[in-house]
Amino acid sequence: MSEMQQPWSLVGLTEAEYRRVVEILGREPNPTELHMFGVMWSEHCAYKHSKAALRRLPTRGEHVLQGPGENAGVVRIDDDLAVAFKLESHNHPSFVDPFNGAATGVGGILRDVFTMGARPVATLNSLRFGPLDEPKQRELLRGVVAGIGHYGNTVGVPCIGGEVYFDESYRGNCLVNAMCIGILRPDRIHRGIAAGPGNAIMVVGNPTGRDGIHAASLLASAEFSGSEAEAALPTVPVGDPFAEKMLMEACLELFETDAVVGIQDMGAAGLISSSSEMAARGGVGVELDVRKVPAREEGMEPWEFLLSESQERMLVCVKKGREAEVEAICRKWGVGCAVIGRVTDDGMVRVLDDGRVVAEVPARALAEAPVYHPAKAEPAYLAELRAFDWSRLPEPEDWNETLLRLLGSPNIGARAWIYEQFDHMVQAGTVLGPGGDAGVIRLGAAVAPGAHGLTRQPPGEGLPGRSGQAGPPKGIAASVDCNGRYVYLNPRRGTAIAVAEAARNCVVTGARPVAITNNCNFGNPEKPEIFWTFDEAITGMAEACEALGTPVTGGNVSFYNETSGEAIHPTPTIGMIAVHENLDRLTTPGFKQVGDVILLLGETRDELGGSEYARLIHGVLAGDAPALDLAFEKRLQDVVLRAIHEGLVTAAHDVAEGGLAVALAEMAIAAAEPSLGCQVSIFLGEGRVDGQLFGESQSRILVTATREQVGRLQALLMVEQIPFRVLGDVTADGRFRLAALAPGSGSAHVYRRQELIDLPVADLVRAHKEAIPRWMDA
């Protein structure tokens, strides 16, 4: 019998891991126990290849109430409010079944947040697909977007932002990362723990079926060979968002009692994962009878009950004698529930089948899988790509056409085709929705602290401050960011850039970054080059989080994003949370009024590595990721926040994909009036013109200021030693004009002016708007 036919390999274990199981138990595991170890020691559940590296991330900070290890991280906003948030992937299921994979990804991240005792108030998403000119990729995009919209809209949680990229590296593995934000009281955090021998273990939510069995161990913990997608269709669960809504309301009401000891979402690996993790955290055991689990299918085996990933289910540890209260609340909301077991004091997960013991395993053994330290090797491609000679690339003859092509790229253009399928105004708390630098919600618009938890509050009402009096309206800004091309070219720096840009996107709205969650999407960690990339990315993430003061509160690692041996670009997505102390100072990117002065903060270098311009116009992905000075990044962000809150800035926008010319165009596109345009000039040195226009140098922010305030702004920038240039003015003619100034012959103070771009803003709007619809609506 070959190893692939051995029982352990059929559940995803290696022979060495199987031998360790035998050593732990002191005997051969029976089939049910083997299934239990198979899922709990899978990469998806155990993080066995990533755990050692993740320990290097900074996880402590003045705002952090709950760091990694729980269903979601929690940060304090003030004495009355905290935010729970989490970012997680549903990549493999979404490639197999785009609609259901994406929908259940939203459902899972919502449960992760409301399990903590928080009411979900916003979601974001980070999506990756192959090129849109391929029918398969358009099919994936349609299915994923429809699934996200169906689930989120039905539950009634607004989608306030996100990002999407299209690149050849995601052709065989799309990425679907979902983020959720919830509001709770700082003293009302609920955790996934079982405690108190004799306390009841209850399952709350939908009945259990066979859907999703082994999805964690065999779908999300292995790479595709190209044929698995069709064969694995039955492993993707189907979600019910209305049931999720009822489950959420029931759980939030349960939290207003003191009957709940602990609660855990039954997500990946289902009942066995939630029960063993709760027991291990509490240092106790649990005894479960699978025949007491409400089932929707006949003849289910014990291991099927344990591994089912049927959606919309929770496992709850309830104080002994309080079961009837839980049942009454569940009945009120039309949610099923049943007592299926009890907490024990022996540290064992004991599984019964109608009273007969069918499995008995130490809870800690299931929860503490082997930790590996894979071999590392720097990829050979890096040296070749970094040696690329940029002088080989000709500069465009038509700068107007080049700008329009970039604005029409699906990686830069408007995402309205996507986010218009999502409800971003439900709950009446959205201040800035999708399409800007970051999403922003108003605290107090939908929920506020009550005597026992969270209660409804009319839109627009302020929240009490520390003094108990109404203060300035507060908000939460959030963004998700990662440029996989940067990480491909320089994993350490590219990941640091992802953290910096996620923070910068919040800062330009006026919000101060406080913490991150992450979703690390990589290929097969057993390949030394892939693991080297992952390890470098974690180093870059740690360095950036330390420099910017944004600790990591949790996240997710998704390995094995490969098909036929071809891995995705490494994509460590960052979800950033920032606090807006005064929404009256909220800043948006669009030009506001004629005569405002346009300034560029930060320095532009001759950098084209990883840029959208190089890839789209020249078909080149080469060079190095843009340079990043984290100390300067922190200073820049602090100064911009100060300028915004002192009322010195009328608009602010991060310079990112597409570079300076695209960022300026985006400010014109988002202008308060369609008649607004701009007249700007850039100074040329010895570098390339395209590098000045479309290079993606980091730590740059565009701002506008009134003529009355621009002097104060310039003085602040000079005192804080922030380099800046006055580029020009907002105009009233509805045109976008960009000229280059080059040193003339003779005097150093004489400049030769060359008009590079002169276009109606309406043309920019049209190109930007049609970037995705021209493919999807063709």
UniProtKB/Swiss-Prot annotation:
Catalysis: reaction(s): N(2)-formyl-N(1)-(5-phospho-beta-D-ribosyl)glycinamide + L-glutamine + ATP + H2O = 2-formamido-N(1)-(5-O-phospho-beta-D-ribosyl)acetamidine + L-glutamate + ADP + phosphate + H(+)
Sites where the protein binds Mg(2+) 2: 112, 265
Alphabetical list of CDD domains matching this protein: PurL_repeat1, PurL_repeat2
Protein's cellular compartments: Cytoplasm
Residues of the active site: 44, 90
Pathway of action: Purine metabolism; IMP biosynthesis via de novo pathway; 5-amino-1-(5-phospho-D-ribosyl)imidazole from N(2)-formyl-N(1)-(5-phospho-D-ribosyl)glycinamide: step 1/2
Binding site for substrate: 89-92, 111, 309-311, 558
InterPro entries, A to Z: PRibForGlyAmidine_synth_PurL, PurL_linker, PurM-like_C_dom, PurM-like_C_sf, PurM-like_N, PurM-like_N_sf
Superkingdom of the source species: Bacteria
Annotated region described as Disordered, given as residue ranges: 455-474
Residues reported to bind Mg(2+) 1: 88, 556
Known EC number: 6.3.5.3
GO CC annotation terms, alphabetical: cytoplasm
Protein residues bound to ATP: 47, 86, 518, 555
Pfam families per UniProt: AIRS, AIRS_C, FGAR-AT_linker
Similarity comment: Belongs to the FGAMS family.
Reported function: Part of the phosphoribosylformylglycinamidine synthase complex involved in the purines biosynthetic pathway. Catalyzes the ATP-dependent conversion of formylglycinamide ribonucleotide (FGAR) and glutamine to yield formylglycinamidine ribonucleotide (FGAM) and glutamate. The FGAM synthase complex is composed of three subunits. PurQ produces an ammonia molecule by converting glutamine to glutamate. PurL transfers the ammonia molecule to FGAR to form FGAM in an ATP-dependent manner.
Subunit structure: Monomer. Part of the FGAM synthase complex composed of 1 PurL, 1 PurQ and 2 PurS subunits.
UniProt-recorded name of the protein: Phosphoribosylformylglycinamidine synthase subunit PurL
Organism: Symbiobacterium thermophilum (strain DSM 24528 / JCM 14929 / IAM 14863 / T)
